[in-house]
Regions:
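Non-catalytic C-terminal accessory region of glycerolipid acyltransferases
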Residues: 1-106
Length: 106
């Protein structure tokens, strides 16, 4: 993985998506579900699809992961209450940064 900003904090990000997209020329899409009110007393969901920015498939992994994180962040910012904030993106810190794991309890 490579570190790239996610909500202003360096986050270790997978490079597999960018490598596969770069090698295959495949179209990359983002897909996510949004919880919606059905007015019928049970939850409903709306499925959203969006094309990823071209930079997600850049052969330079640093460019690809920065584009990936920026796009995911933009989706999360649409409705922050719908994002899975329990996913611990910042557990591993950049080497030599002096930053500590923000999830450790002291």
């Amino acid at each position: 993985g490579e570190f790239a900003p996610f909500f202003g904090v360096q986050a270790l990000t997978m490079t597999l998506l960018g490598r596969l997209a770069s090698r295959t020329g495949a179209t990359v899409l983002f897909a996510w579900c949004e919880r919606v009110d059905t007015h019928a007393g049970h939850p409903g969901f709306a499925l959203h699809l969006q094309s990823a920015p071209d930079a997600v498939s850049d052969p330079d992994p640093k460019i690809a992961v920065a584009a990936l994180n920026a796009a995911v962040e933009a989706i999360a910012r649409r409705d922050p209450a719908q994002y899975q904030w329990t996913y611990k993106r910042y557990t591993l810190r950049p080497p030599g940064s002096g930053e500590e794991n923000p999830y450790w309890n002291r």
